[in-house]
Amino acid sequence: MNNIIDGKALANEILADLKLEIQELTSQTNASPKLAIVLVGDNPASIIYVRHKIKNAHKVGIYTLLINLSATIHTNDLISKINELNLDNEISGIIVQLPLPSSIDKNKILSAISPSKDIDGFHPLNVGYLHSGISQGFIPCTALGCLAAIKKYEPNLTGKNVVIIGRSNIVGKPLSALLLKENCSVTICHSKTHNLRSITSKADIVVAAIGSPLKLTAEYFNPESIVIDVGINRISSNKIIGDVDFENVQSKVQYITPVPGGIGPMTIAFLLKNTVKAFKDSLYTLDT
C-alpha cells in the first residue's frame, strides 16, 4: 500500500533547490550562509541531531560553526556567547540545541538570540509575528515541515478539520497558527483532553506530537485520515519509534508519515531553508 508520506524524499527535493539557490547567491555576492550551532552538554540524542544538521548543511553549501559548551555553564555565560554570535556578521543563523540542562533558563537563552538570526523561530518576537498573522520573521521548522508534508498530498486545506495532539511551542502552537491561516478548523488536544479517540476519529488530518510511544492505534483514525507523526521516542540506542502504531495504522488511513523518515528530515530541510532566508535578509540589510 503506497500511502506513506516519504519525508526523506520531500526533504531531498527542498535540499536540492537550496543547493542551487546557495550556489547562485554565492556567485553573486562572494559570500555564503553560515549556521552557528550551540550544543550544551553531551546529551547523546542531541549529539546525533546536531550531526544530522551539520551533514545536511554541508550538502547544500552552508558553512557550520559548532560550539560545544559544558553542561555546567551558567545562563549568563551562555547569553554572553550568544551575544558574540549575534554581533558576528558572518553568522547568518543561530540555534541552541534543545533540551538544555535544567540549571539553565531556557526562556532567557532563546530570547537572547537576535530575532534576525533566530532560525528556530523561538524568540518571542518571531512567535508574536506568527500568531499575529504577520508575514515576517521565522517560523519553527517542525511546524513548517508538517505543513509542507500535508500540502503535498492535500493542497487545498480550506475547511479541513485538523486535530493536533500536543501544545508545545515547537509543534502544536505554531502549526495551529499555520493551519488557521490555511482556513482549517483546528482543535488542539493534550494530556488533559477527555475522549481523545472520539475527537481524532472524526478529523480529516491528525498530527501526533505527544512523545508517547505507539500511543495512537487504528481506532483513533478513519479511512480518510491523513496522519502526521511527529513523535520521536528512542527505545534503544539505535531504534526510534513514533507516537502512532504505524504497523497497524498504515493500512487503515489515507496517508501517514513513518518514524524515522517522516517529519525529521523535513524539519532539518526547513531549518536550512530558514538559514538561507536569514542570509538573504542580512544581504538586504547591508545594502540599505
Swiss-Prot record:
Gene Ontology terms for molecular function: methenyltetrahydrofolate cyclohydrolase activity; methylenetetrahydrofolate dehydrogenase (NADP+) activity
Record bears the keyword Oxidoreductase: yes
Substrates-to-products reaction catalysed: (6R)-5,10-methylene-5,6,7,8-tetrahydrofolate + NADP(+) = (6R)-5,10-methenyltetrahydrofolate + NADPH; (6R)-5,10-methenyltetrahydrofolate + H2O = (6R)-10-formyltetrahydrofolate + H(+)
Pfam families: THF_DHG_CYH (PF00763), THF_DHG_CYH_C (PF02882)
Subunit structure comment from the entry: Homodimer.
Gene: folD
PROSITE patterns for this protein: THF_DHG_CYH_1, THF_DHG_CYH_2
Stated role: Catalyzes the oxidation of 5,10-methylenetetrahydrofolate to 5,10-methenyltetrahydrofolate and then the hydrolysis of 5,10-methenyltetrahydrofolate to 10-formyltetrahydrofolate.
GO cellular component: a single term: cytosol
Keyword Amino-acid biosynthesis belongs to the record: yes
Record pathway: One-carbon metabolism; tetrahydrofolate interconversion
GO BP, one annotated term: purine nucleotide biosynthetic process
Family: Belongs to the tetrahydrofolate dehydrogenase/cyclohydrolase family.
Species of provenance: Rickettsia rickettsii (strain Sheila Smith)
Protein name: Bifunctional protein FolD
Keyword vocabulary terms for this entry: Amino-acid biosynthesis, Histidine biosynthesis, Hydrolase, Methionine biosynthesis, Multifunctional enzyme, NADP, One-carbon metabolism, Oxidoreductase, Purine biosynthesis
Superkingdom assignment: Bacteria
Binding site for NADP(+): G166, R167, S168, S191, I232
Entry EC no(s): 1.5.1.5, 3.5.4.9
